[in-house]
């Protein structure tokens, strides 16, 4: 099934759908009291949408949407739950993944409500590098996955598109970002403006200190992404969807 940009799956309740993203890019979002959308998590190919609230049959104010044209494979809630019930190991891995998802989702939401526009963009790029591990070139620069457009970046970080374009142009002029073949390539120096709240063993009550390392670290403040730790460790789950 192909979802056009902005289309949503039916998630939540006792008739919710679960979608395996085959291509494109999905996202989790919610609306504030002014009906503005806020994206707090990205869902790349190979990951699931609708699998969290469909576990509980709760209806929540979160929309599982296609950020761009996205191909998905849909399965009904009852079928998915029956599969988990018959595979306890996968069910446990899935539950752990849900917990990890919520942790990173909260980081993404906090970042988008507390960081400056420039820091949000740097945090998004840092998250893509950390979680999807693109290979650095000879100059220590990282090609970002997904070839995000300025419009998509503005949607993700909740910043007006002209502001995003202005920041990207400034980063390019300072040698921190290069655009090649519709793809952004970023220098690790861009991440120097981010903070590491766990640096030097800092706890929740400790003062946040600036991170001085040039290479990105796993503990950098980052916008949420369905990352590698959230991925189901058992390869039978994709096989289950392939057989539908």
List each model region and its residues:
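A residue-level structural signature of the nucleotidyltransferase/glycosyltransferase Rossmann-like core
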Residues: 18, 40, 72-73, 145, ...
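Cyclic-nucleotide recognition modules
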Residues: 41-107
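Phosphate-/nucleic-acid-contacting segments
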Residues: 130-230, 240-244
């Amino acid at each position: 099934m192909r979802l056009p940009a902005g289309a949503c799956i039916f998630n939540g309740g006792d008739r919710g759908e679960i979608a395996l993203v085959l291509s494109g890019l999905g996202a989790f979002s919610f609306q504030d009291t002014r009906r503005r959308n806020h994206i707090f998590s990205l869902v790349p190919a190979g990951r699931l949408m609708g699998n969290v609230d469909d576990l509980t049959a709760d209806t929540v104010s979160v929309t599982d949407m296609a950020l761009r044209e996205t191909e998905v494979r849909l399965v009904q809630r009852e079928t998915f739950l029956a599969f988990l019930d018959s595979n306890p190991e996968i069910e446990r891995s899935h539950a752990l993944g849900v917990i990890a998802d919520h942790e990173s989702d909260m980081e993404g939401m906090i970042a988008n409500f507390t960081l400056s526009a420039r820091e949000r963009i740097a945090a998004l790029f840092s998250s893509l590098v950390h979680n999807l591990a693109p290979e650095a070139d000879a100059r220590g620069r990282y090609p970002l996955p997904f070839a995000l457009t300025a419009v998509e970046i503005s949607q993700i970080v909740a910043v007006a598109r002209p502001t995003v374009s202005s920041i990207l142009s400034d980063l390019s002029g300072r040698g921190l970002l290069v655009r090649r073949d519709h793809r952004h390539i970023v220098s690790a120096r861009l991440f120097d403006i981010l903070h590491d709240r766990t640096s030097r063993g800092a706890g929740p009550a400790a003062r946040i200190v600036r991170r001085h390392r040039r290479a990105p670290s796993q503990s950098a403040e980052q916008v949420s992404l369905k990352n590698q730790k959230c991925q189901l460790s058992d390869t039978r789950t994709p096989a289950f969807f392939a057989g539908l």
